């Protein structure tokens, strides 16, 4: 982002296997015995803490004992600012626009100063008046989720839905009375331990009737402007996705280094056999570094149907191949693969749907 800033080194303080370099920048282990002079580093260099906030205090203490004077925790606000600045620069470099919902005007397209950002010819659906359009962002929660540290009131457009509700059949006290749950009608609630919030997505696909449907998480909510629906409709937006996340060395390798690589390879082979027209695009996209995480979105009902019709057959086959994993985190691999697949779906359908991005929060 800033050519005047030069990164001298990366630090880590865990027991995992870490690379010796990232690009041409050296990677060093950080502890209270680290000899900075032997590493040819200066204690006057600023150190940015790019890890989770719960670790900042401990790492700051180590850095101070070593002798570093300028220690800058990367806050949520700083992370959002840097991420958006990087994405704007990156998209410009590849000849595309990085369009954020909060940058669009809540005015009719014909008078909006930003109307030129969107190619209205890409959609043939006219929603008409905003107040005639129904819209809900469903916030997914499990009956077994840990409570938030602080209560977070839902927005007027948000509705809570319980995923994996079938597992609370014998513990009715875990679900509020009249709770919206994913185990009625056509459902896959029993797959929740692997499919995570996707069991709620499947239920919404089969049962929700709103014109615009969103999916969020009880710890992760979209940061939407108050008039988000007006901005979406008046600028003829089809889809809102979370601001993309950068991962290294690639989207593919990021998944394979954390999960069973054979599940990824099976998924790619499935795409090659069943969606050959998309395979080359998938291969290229997954070699890149960006995807929208967390299985979050807001989209028109017709788009949701197109996405789910494409997505779930792939995930069912991947889950049949991979089976159950002993580790509960690793067992959620269909949910993690879905994050990458949703991003891929909208990449290969860029000419079909108008897409913008929005930031999200994380609640401890």
Regions found by a protein language model. Give the residues of each.
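ER/Golgi luminal nucleotide-sugar-dependent glycosyltransferases, focusing on the catalytic module
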Residues: 89-364
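Redox-cofactor binding/interface segments in oxidoreductases and associated redox assembly factors
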Residues: 12, 48-50, 215, 242
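A short alpha->loop->secondary-structure connector
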Residues: 5, 68, 228
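Conserved acidic residues
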Residues: 8, 44-46, 211, 238
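Short internal beta-strands
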Residues: 7-14
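Glycine-rich adenosine-cofactor-binding loop
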Residues: 1-3
